[in-house]
């Protein structure tokens, strides 16, 4: 979890084979309406995100039901979003990829993304509710290190039960 540009996709893809999990990019689960809205530089509302979050939760529960592990890259910016994702899934774990606005802005302006312009980064930081101590299923990882170091730190956290 984390704002756009925090490395969710890159880290998720690198971590998945390490922990024998399927990688699913939550960006690919957005409705066309949401994609069009973001491409136009319009931030998503809670209502816009609801169906997307419900689909992500469903995909996660399906993996649990089949006894398989998955990594779903998803912003999960608010605690209420994370709570929705936790519904009927006691095995869910979150990895919060934490970085400063300046670091992530620098990254996001150097990449090409199909629909997420750098102008929306501020709205993501404005929406972000960083996980607190009451969210025991969240591990916070600083992204101010290399991809292999981040993957190693997550793998050592032993999130798969």
Language-model features: locations:
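Small-molecule kinase domains that catalyze NTP-dependent phosphoryl transfer to phosphate-bearing small molecules
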Residues: 110-153
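Conserved beta-strand scaffold positions in the cores of enzyme catalytic domains, especially
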Residues: 23, 28, 94, 138-140
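P-loop (Walker A) phosphate-binding loop of NTP-binding proteins
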Residues: 3
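C-terminal alpha-helix
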Residues: 153-161
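Glycine-rich phosphate-binding loop used to anchor ATP phosphates in small-molecule kinases
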Residues: 47-88, 97
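Conserved substrate/cofactor phosphate-moiety recognition/catalytic segment
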Residues: 6, 13-58
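Conserved nucleotide-binding/hydrolysis micro-motifs of P-loop NTPases
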Residues: 29-30, 76-78, 99-103, 146
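Conserved phosphate-donor/acceptor-positioning beta-strand/loop module used by diverse small-molecule
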Residues: 88-107
């Amino acid at each position: 979890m984390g704002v756009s540009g925090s490395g969710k996709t890159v880290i998720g893809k690198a971590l998945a084979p390490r922990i024998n999990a399927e990688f699913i990019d939550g960006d690919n689960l957005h409705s066309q309406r949401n994609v069009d809205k973001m491409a136009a530089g319009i931030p998503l509302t809670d209502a816009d995100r609801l169906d997307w979050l419900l689909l992500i939760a469903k995909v996660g529960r399906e993996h649990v039901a089949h006894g398989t592990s998955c990594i779903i890259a998803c912003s999960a910016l608010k605690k209420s979003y994370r709570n929705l994702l936790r519904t009927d899934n006691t095995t869910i774990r979150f990895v919060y990829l934490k970085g400063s606005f300046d670091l992530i802005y620098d990254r996001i302006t150097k990449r090409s993304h199909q629909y997420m312009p750098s102008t929306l980064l501020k709205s993501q930081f404005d929406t972000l509710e960083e996980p607190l101590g009451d969210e025991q299923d969240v591990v916070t990882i600083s992204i101010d290190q290399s991809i292999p170091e981040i993957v190693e730190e997550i793998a050592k956290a032993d999130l798969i039960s």
